[in-house]
From Swiss-Prot:
GO terms for biological process: arachidonate secretion; lipid catabolic process; phospholipid metabolic process; venom-mediated edema in another organism; venom-mediated myocyte killing in another organism; venom-mediated suppression of blood coagulation. Its EC number is 3.1.1.4. Ca(2+) binds at G28, G30, D47. This is Phospholipase A2 A2-actitoxin-Cgg2a. Coiled coil: none annotated. Keywords: Blood coagulation cascade inhibiting toxin, Disulfide bond, Hemostasis impairing toxin, Hydrolase, Inflammatory response, Metal-binding, Myotoxin, Nematocyst, Secreted, Toxin. Lacks hemolytic activity. Binds 1 Ca(2+) ion per subunit. CDD domains: PLA2c (cd00125). It catalyses: a 1,2-diacyl-sn-glycero-3-phosphocholine + H2O = a 1-acyl-sn-glycero-3-phosphocholine + a fatty acid + H(+). One of its GO terms (cellular component) is extracellular region.
Length: 119
């Protein structure tokens, strides 16, 4: 869920998770236009990942699951134990991929709290 994603961001990037809220055109709720840089592209890919597990004829998760569904992870891996559902593992995989992407790319302060109307 949201809190687990926030924890991952803080732990693996060393940044406050709120730094990513409103970053560029895609970080935070919704998104439009072209990503402004590599970090914003991480958010775009994260949105695409969530869409892939919540849409289509046989979705793995409900549309709201990514915001409340708990999952289990150790280190940088999603748990495959009996406590974690298929949906939870899918959400976890999307979140871990995003965090690894954030960590690989430069955070540019000029894109924090970016004006979405220019996207």
């Amino acid at each position: 869920g949201v809190w687990q994603f926030a924890y991952m961001i803080a732990k693996y990037t060393g940044r406050n998770p709120l730094d990513y809220w409103g970053y560029g055109c895609w970080c935070g709720l919704g998104g439009k236009g072209n990503p402004v840089d590599a970090v914003d592209r991480c958010c775009y890919v994260h949105d695409v990942c969530y869409n892939s597990i919540t849409q289509g004829p046989r979705p793995t998760c409900s549309r709201i699951a990514p915001y409340h569904k708990n999952y289990y992870f150790t280190g940088k891996k999603c748990s495959t134990g009996w406590l974690t559902s298929k949906c939870g593992r899918a959400i976890c995989a999307c979140d871990i991929a995003a965090v690894k992407c954030f960590r690989r790319n430069h955070f540019n302060k000029k894109y924090r709290l970016y004006k979405k109307n220019i996207c």
